[in-house]
Amino acid sequence: MEQAVADLEAIRAAVGVVTWIVAGHSWGGDLAVRYAVDHPEAVAAVVSIAGRGPQRDQTWSEAYKAGRATQPVVDIDHVPEVHAALGDSFTEWTHRADLWRGLATCGVPMYFIAAGDDIRPSWPLAQLAALVPHGRFATVADVPHDFWFTHPEVWTSTITDACTGP
């Protein structure tokens, strides 16, 4: 995760953007939050869709595992070693002593959006929205986790509204 944050910052600097809206889906939503905490001066807002939130709660994991087979299959070519490394770096982030203080004092507006039919419980996103000073939370009804794939028109309007809304 630390490398991904550094990569985002390098891209921002290379293209000469002063501030930007950082949007992400799933792990990318959590990355957007981490990036905003580490580089608040560069982030106008965060849009996190169907993220996990910085937690390793057993009940969350059990619900995720129990419902996995019910989700639409999205065939994404990925490298298992990279996926494992990203998971490990996420765990390292959740164990940081200053994690919650950094979130609670981050002045970046953050919009957390849950997918209504996601097997991932949305309570961590609602908690984050309540924790960060300028947090908002909403649920998009009747869409699964990967609704960018299953409902692209809903995805497009969700992202557009989130980036242009209050």
Which residues fall in each region the model found?
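Short beta-strand/loop motif that positions the catalytic acidic residue
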Residues: 106, 112-114
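Catalytic histidine-centered segment of alpha/beta-hydrolase-like enzymes
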Residues: 143-152, 156
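Active-site loop/oxyanion-hole signature of alpha/beta-hydrolase fold enzymes
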Residues: 1-23, 157
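Flexible "cap/lid" loop of the alpha/beta hydrolase fold
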Residues: 30-38, 44-72
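Active-site nucleophile elbow and catalytic-triad environment of alpha/beta-hydrolase enzymes
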Residues: 85-102
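Catalytic histidine neighborhood in serine/cysteine hydrolases
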Residues: 131-146
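Conserved alpha/beta-hydrolase "acid-adjacent" motif
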Residues: 119-124
